[in-house]
């Protein structure tokens, strides 16, 4: 009996679909979180720009932090894509593991971007009236950013499980 690659129960032909889905979801959801954070905090920055233009540069911190979220998704997507090859056998375990990596970093960055956007918008508006709030706002932004970092760390740990 001739064995074909698709006859392997542990590496069916549809297994790479889950890996590609994980790669795509890591980028899509992370960039969506970055876009939400940038848009929401950008509204606040545009609002204070007409009253106090000198505060705009200090108020860009939420936008920069939101952009970093997309980098988290990019790192995980590149690692997942590096494990995909048309010539090597790809198991269903690796497919599900890569899907969970993408979902983990994607949803973590999505929620982080939403939090950064809300804190950035309200924080920038209140900072215009009370400059002493700056340190507190930055601390809250850091805690919001760390949510996305946690998702990336878990995705990296999961990704190493497939390489063993």
From Swiss-Prot:
Residue ranges that the UniProt entry lists as topological domain Cytoplasmic: 38-59, 120-136
GO molecular function: proton-transporting ATPase activity, rotational mechanism
Marked site (Essential for proton translocation) residue numbers: 145
Subcellular location(s) of the protein: Vacuole membrane
GO CC entries: fungal-type vacuole; vacuolar proton-transporting V-type ATPase, V0 domain
Xref: SUPFAM superfamilies: F1F0 ATP synthase subunit C
Family statement drawn from the similarity comment of this UniProt entry: Belongs to the V-ATPase proteolipid subunit family.
Function: Proton-conducting pore forming subunit of the V0 complex of vacuolar(H+)-ATPase (V-ATPase), a multisubunit enzyme composed of a peripheral complex (V1) that hydrolyzes ATP and a membrane integral complex (V0) that translocates protons. V-ATPase is responsible for acidifying and maintaining the pH of intracellular compartments.
NCBIfam families found in the cross-reference section: V_ATP_synt_C (TIGR01100)
Record protein name field: V-type proton ATPase subunit c'
Organism: Candida glabrata (strain ATCC 2001 / BCRC 20586 / JCM 3761 / NBRC 0622 / NRRL Y-65 / CBS 138) (Yeast)
Gene name of this polypeptide: VMA11
